[in-house]
A protein has these predicted regions:
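Conserved ABC ATPase signature
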Residues: 147-152, 156
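A short, proline-enriched helix->beta-strand linker immediately N-terminal to the Walker B motif
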Residues: 167-171
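Short catalytic/signature loops enriched in Gly
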Residues: 3, 139, 143, 235-292
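A short, surface-exposed alpha-helical micro-motif characterized by mixed small hydrophobic
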Residues: 215-217
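Conserved ABC transporter NBD signature motif
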Residues: 60-72
C-alpha cells in the first residue's frame, strides 16, 4: 500500500540562503497519526505548509520530493497540484479565533471547499457539514451554520474547523497545533474529539505540536525536529521509553512534573536557530543540554 504522505530529502531556503528545512524525510501511512515535535523555529509548521502548498513566498524548496499516495507534487502543474492537495488533504489550523472570516456566516465558509474543489452540489455540501457538526458534538448545527464566527466560543469555532477538515474525507489532515489557542479544559476535549474522528474516518494525521504530553496521547509515530532537521524518529512508546538523541532527552526532561509544585523548569539550553545550523558544522549531532 502506498504511503499517504512521503517526504524525501526535502530542503527549503530563505532568500539569504539560510536553510529552514534540511533534508527532511518522513512517511505517514494510511490511517496513521504522526507527530512532528520540536521547539518554536524547528521547522514543524514549515513542513505542514509545504505539504499543503502554502509555503510563504520567501521560502523556496531547493531539493527533495513530496508524494501524496504515490503522486509527486513537484511533477504536477500548478492547477493539478492544487486539485490534488485540495481533494486529498485538509488543515486544522492553530488559531480558531482568526481562521474564520468574521464577515461571513459559518455555513458558506465550511461548504465552499466542497463545492468549488470537489464539485459537490450546495445541497450535498450543506448536508455533509450538518452531519460533521453533529459528529463534533455541536448540538444545534442548523443554528451554528447561520452564525457569524464572533457568535461562537473559541472551542466551538475549533469544532467547526475540525468538521470542515473531515467533511470531504481527505486522506491526510495536517493539524497545526490545533489546541494551542484554547484553555486547558477545552484542549482535552478537542484532542479527544480529533482522535475519535481520526479513528472513525481512518484518516491519516500529521500532528504538529511542541507539547510532548499531546504527542503521548494522540500519535503512533514521532519525528523530532531540531534546526530544520529530523534528528530522531520512532514509535511513540519507544521514543519516551528510550530517547536516543540528546535534544529529545532534553525535551522530555524539560516537561513539567507536578510531583513537586516548587520545582524549577529545566531549560533547554544552547539551541540553534534553524537558519544558522548550516553555519555550525554538525550542529544537529553536537548539541548537548547542560543537564543530563
Amino acid at each position: 500500500m502506498e504511503p499517504c504522505l512521503e517526504i524525501r530529502s526535502l530542503s527549503a531556503v530563505l532568500p539569504n540562503g539560510q536553510r529552514v528545512l534540511r533534508s527532511v524525510s518522513l512517511t505517514v501511512q494510511p490511517g496513521e497519526v504522526r507527530a512532528l515535535v520540536g521547539e518554536s523555529g524547528a521547522g514543524k509548521t514549515m513542513i505542514g505548509k509545504a505539504v499543503l502548498g502554502v509555503l510563504p513566498k520567501s521560502v523556496r524548496i531547493v531539493e527533495g520530493e513530496m508524494l501524496i499516495e504515490g503522486e509527486s507534487l513537484g511533477r504536477l502543474d500548478a492547477k493539478a497540484r492544487r486539485t490534488l492537495i485540495g481533494a486529498r488533504t485538509a488543515l486544522i489550523p492553530q488559531d480558531p479565533l482568526t481562521a474564520l472570516n468574521p464577515s461571513r456566516r459559518i455555513g458558506p465558509q465550511t461548504t465552499d471547499r466542497l463545492v468549488r474543489i470537489l464539485g459537490w452540489s450546495g445541497e450535498k455540501a450543506d448536508e455533509r457539514i450538518r452531519q460533521l457538526l453533529q459528529e463534533v458534538q455541536i448540538r444545534e448545527p442548523e443554528r451554528v451554520l447561520k452564525c457569524y464566527p464572533h457568535e461562537l466560543s473559541g472551542g466551538m469555532r475549533q469544532r467547526v474547523l475540525i468538521a470542515a477538515a473531515f467533511a470531504a474525507e481527505p486522506r491526510l489532515i495536517v493539524a497545526d497545533e490545533p489546541t494551542t489557542a484554547l484553555d486547558v479544559t477545552v484542549q482535552k476535549q478537542i484532542l479527544r474529539l480529533i482522535a475519535q474522528l481520526q479513528r472513525n474516518h481512518g484518516t491519516a494525521l500529521l500532528f504538529v505540536t511542541h507539547d510532548l504530553g499531546v504527542v503521548a496521547k494522540i500519535s503512533q509515530k514521532v519525528s523530532v525536529l531540531y534546526a530544520g532537521k529530523v534528528v530522531e524518529e520512532a514509535a511513540t512508546a519507544d521514543l519516551f521509553a528510550s530517547p536516543q538523541h540528546p535534544y529529545t532527552r532534553a525535551l522530555i526532561a524539560a516537561t513539567p512534573r507536578y510531583t513537586d509544585p516548587y520545582a524549577s523548569l529545566m531549560p533547554v539550553n544552547e539551541t540553534v536557530l534553524a537558519g544558522l545550523a548550516d553555519e555550525i558544522a554538525g550542529a544537529d549531532r553536537a548539541w548537548r543540554p547542560s543537564h543530563g
